[in-house]
């Protein structure tokens, strides 16, 4: 089973396309939607829904994927639910990047500090990071600097922030999903 979390643009038709692409790895792809506007509520909602999907799914190699803001959530929720994560162009500092887009972006800071101390150290090698060299929204070099100590970084030379085409990375994701 693969759980897919959209980014800030939850209504983008690209989300459906990504789900279809991920079905080449596993036919059981679950799209879990969340508001993007209420971080504390989103955290509770995503924890509940992902945990329920994992319990019902019966796949010992479940995986959670997210793009942009979905990458922020996939890394944390996947860690808390004990499943591997694949994050594309993750928004690692939504409290900064969401200024002016949502009412209380500072809630992201609260979530980041309250998650689990040193969670990336505890999550070491359980997350695969795919970064675009052409991300027009986030500084992918900074993301690589923050994450390379903990996770494998895969660079993409073609995609932009929304990462419309996952195809070149599907075999790598499939191999990562099936690791013991």
Swiss-Prot record:
<dbReference type="InterPro" id="IPR022987">
    <property type="entry name" value="UPF0227"/>
</dbReference>
<dbReference type="InterPro" id="IPR008886">
    <property type="entry name" value="UPF0227/Esterase_YqiA"/>
</dbReference>
<dbReference type="InterPro" id="IPR029058">
    <property type="entry name" value="AB_hydrolase_fold"/>
</dbReference>
<comment type="similarity">
    <text>Belongs to the UPF0227 family.</text>
</comment>
<protein>
    <recommendedName>
        <fullName>UPF0227 protein Spro_1925</fullName>
    </recommendedName>
</protein>
<dbReference type="Pfam" id="PF05728">
    <property type="entry name" value="UPF0227"/>
</dbReference>
